[in-house]
A protein has these predicted regions:
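Extended, charged catalytic domains and RNA/DNA-binding interfaces, predominantly
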Residues: 1-255
Length: 255
């Protein structure tokens, strides 16, 4: 049937698609950050089509337990994780559901896990009643997420591997990690030489975690941006967003 109408492959067309803009990785004061959570949702609703306001949830391999100089740093992080588990997560899920309005403004449940070995990741959930899944590592997290509608996405990938930068040896190609976060207020992880250098407080960029390094290894993935800002203002100017081409602003179409 080659050359006939019946034999033509039907390709997706942009003629019936629209651009929708969101921020799927940003923070407020529900864990460590600034700005009220409701104000964050209101800010998102005023300028975005969809959002996930992201609590920090865990750091399984947090270092420094044997160094008394770092106790205040550990307490700062673990104290926030404790608050999230003592009612904070339920409040967060409830407010996410409150702001989710099909066809008007979509809200997604997500949360972040830090990792020295694997790099920091965000779990973005399709389900509005998604539980907070405990893990012993990012790889454990990915195993537990199998069979569920969850995207597990690495970010600020260009920091040094072993110090919360990305480790491409652990990349899982497929539906679980269909894209990676290349740009945020941390800077640009396309390479270690380009524009938008990384923030000084977590170190300079390193080639081994960058997008170009992953592509040279033959990895297949999409690219997204997020603000990763910590002041309760999703979609803040210049910090990164994600654009989606979809037929309509519904959960299924955006996902």
């Amino acid at each position: 049937q080659r050359g006939t109408a019946a034999g033509k492959k039907i390709m997706p067309s942009a003629s019936n698609l629209k651009y929708f803009w969101g921020d799927l990785h940003n923070h407020c004061n529900i864990t460590y950050g600034h700005g009220d959570m409701r104000s964050a949702f209101e800010a998102a609703k005023g300028q975005l089509d969809f959002v996930s306001v992201t609590p920090h949830a865990m750091w399984p391999d947090i270092p420094g337990a044997d160094d008394p100089r770092l106790k205040w740093v550990i307490d700062y992080h673990t104290g926030a994780f404790k608050r999230l588990r003592e009612g904070g997560y339920e409040k967060y899920v409830a407010m996410t559901n409150e702001y989710n309005k099909e066809g008007e403004f979509l809200a997604f449940v997500g949360y972040e896990a830090h990792s020295m070995e694997h790099g920091d990741h965000v779990a973005l959930n399709y389900d509005l009643d998604a539980p907070l899944v405990e893990c012993t590592s990012i790889e454990d997290w990915k195993q537990k997420a199998r069979g569920h509608k969850v995207f597990i996405t690495p970010h600020h990938m260009g920091y040094q591997t072993g110090y919360r930068g990305y480790n491409w040896n652990f990349f899982t190609e497929g539906d679980q990690t269909p894209f990676v976060e290349m740009y945020s207020r941390h800077g640009l992880a396309e390479s270690d030489q380009g524009d938008y250098n990384y923030l000084h407080d977590m170190g300079p960029r390193q080639w081994e975690g960058t997008i170009q390094c992953g592509l040279e290894q033959g990895k297949k993935f999409g690219i997204m941006g997020s603000t990763d800002q910590h002041a309760g203002y999703p979609g803040s100017y210049g910090d990164g967003r994600i654009g989606v081409l979809a037929e309509s602003l519904t959960r299924d179409k955006i996902w």
